[in-house]
Amino acid sequence: MLTKAEALAHTVIYRKNSRFDKVKEKSEELTLIGKGRSAYVFALTEGGRKMALKVFFPEYQATAVKEAAIYEKLAGSAFYPDIYETGDSFILMEYIKGETFYNCLKKGIAISDDMIQQVEEALSDARAAGLNPSDIHLRNLILTETGAVRVIDVARFEQTKTCTQWDDLKSAYHALYKKPIFPKKIPGFWLEIIAFLYKKDWFQKHFAQRKRKYS
């Protein structure tokens, strides 16, 4: 007999050739709250408790199993969501109410030294669990209503190559964001352009050229 989470996960049917709106069918009990490269996340309420159901695309079922195992290793850390149930294609987890760092920048919610330090502690917990924190970006860091920072989307925490993404974000925070003249509210359009240029290594190449020019 299927658990409720399994049954609800099975109601989610994705369109195969759609990039932005992949949900073809789903239970009315599920509300779409997040979109990612390998899965969509839905909110559901059971017994008065709100939870998040992450349902992976069929081609990413192996990622579901991998991410569930990583969350199990992180179970002792307060910086990651509690996991209630896992399956071949889904993870049922704690619903974290708050704003992503991405939305903080869009809305002008201040990012503080304490928030940066909490991310550092979260990644330190992951390393202590034998993991290699990777693919840390503004959308998987959440500031809760109590001021706590939580980290989600940990599927790449077992990759072996070095990922400098968090170090680059931290450097930008100290070198740019903390400057009094730097805007604390940035339109999403510009955030997307910055992310695109970063992925294309534009900033890395540009600053490397400047360094060579003035060295």
From Swiss-Prot:
Q: Which PROSITE patterns match?
A: PROTEIN_KINASE_ATP (PS00107)
Question: Is Kinase there in the keyword field?
Answer: yes
This enzyme's EC code(s): 2.7.11.1
Q: Which GO terms describe its molecular function?
A: ATP binding; protein serine kinase activity; protein serine/threonine kinase activity
Q: Which UniProt keywords apply?
A: ATP-binding, Kinase, Nucleotide-binding, Serine/threonine-protein kinase, Transferase
Annotated Protein kinase domain ranges read 27-215
Where along the chain is the active site annotated? D135
Keyword Kinase among record annotations: yes
Q: Which reaction does it catalyse?
A: L-seryl-[protein] + ATP = O-phospho-L-seryl-[protein] + ADP + H(+); L-threonyl-[protein] + ATP = O-phospho-L-threonyl-[protein] + ADP + H(+)
- Entry binding sites for ATP: I33, G34, K35, G36, R37, S38, A39, Y40, V41, K54
Family note: Belongs to the protein kinase superfamily. Ser/Thr protein kinase family.
**Protein name per the record:** Putative serine/threonine-protein kinase YrzF
